[in-house]
Amino acid sequence: MLDVNAHLHTPYSFSAFSSIGEALDHASAEGVKVVGINDFYSMEGYGAWNAGCMLRGLFPLFGIEFISLNEEDQVAGLRVNDPNNPGRTYISGKGLSFPVMLQGKPLQQLEAVRAESNAQVERMCAKLNDWLKSEGHDLVLNFEEIKARYTKGSIRERHLAKALRIALYPDAENPARLENDLRSKLLKAGGPAFVPERPEAFLPMKTVQEIIEAAGGIPTYPFLGDDAKGHFTDFEADLQKAADTLKNRGFRSVEFITTRNTIAVLEQYAGYLEDEGFIVTFGSEHNTPAMEPVRLRTRDASELSDKLKAINWRGACAVAAHQVGLDSADAGEELIHQSIDL
């Protein structure tokens, strides 16, 4: 059984890491042997991820992440895995084909939603410049320059916060915390530079699932789990009902970002879902400025329990098998060991 981190963001979306090489160096140094790239709206990092894994004796998993909208849940006021926006639902894809096979209409749909995501941040940048001027600052942020300097093509409000922090506070003692503060106060809902998403920013849940499947992947529901106060969203509070609904919607894979949750909740939820037939994987995201360990931990412990490690390993083996057209987790396990010469 090997250590797995099946959900890592890279500079192809937003990441704590400055490069794919840095992400994989951290994984290698920490003994994490199976690593999954999982950027928002992008598969462009797959080639570098694959090559970097081969160089370091790691096994690559290929993923992607979307924000979708389920209108039925929205009308019902049901909070799914976005605690502030009913109906808005994050969806990952696991085990996508590499080389990338997406083409035709699904590719056009992906490119359109990514373009709209970038356009929203461009509108945000304009509002941020207006606010800076009103506050007496001479600084003017150049959207295209930020996009070229700090991104691989996909730009988010975190990139604006980073550029602003570097321009105003280049020697900040805690740059990650300051960037989070700037983002929260200026760019999120209620802030002077906030721009709400337009409807075209969100594809229907079913469309996202179809794009993932067209790319060879497994549609995956990311569980939010318990928050710091032990609360769950409307959708996730009843675990059996959530599992049944996910099956009815065509999901057979789920994931958790382990630092959000306690070991007790992870063992309860992940164990139940695996027993229900779901592929279960865990990851860390690393989609904030804060540099955290790649080796997984939980909200209340410095590492996963043996039970959680085993669940994650079995899930990774199933994803690895799917990725190359094999039909069992056992075949995936053999593939991983052969690939990294264990």
Model-derived regions, located:
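Flexible, glycine- and charge-enriched loops at secondary-structure boundaries
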Residues: 39, 198, 232
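Hydrophobic, aromatic-enriched interface-forming segments
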Residues: 125-201
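Extended hydrophobic/aromatic segments used for targeting, binding, or gating
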Residues: 203-213, 217-279
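Extended, intrinsically disordered, low-complexity segments
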Residues: 299-342
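A metal-dependent hydrolase metal-coordination microenvironment
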Residues: 2-155, 249, 255-316
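Acidic/histidine-rich helix-loop elements
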Residues: 8-18, 192-193, 225-234
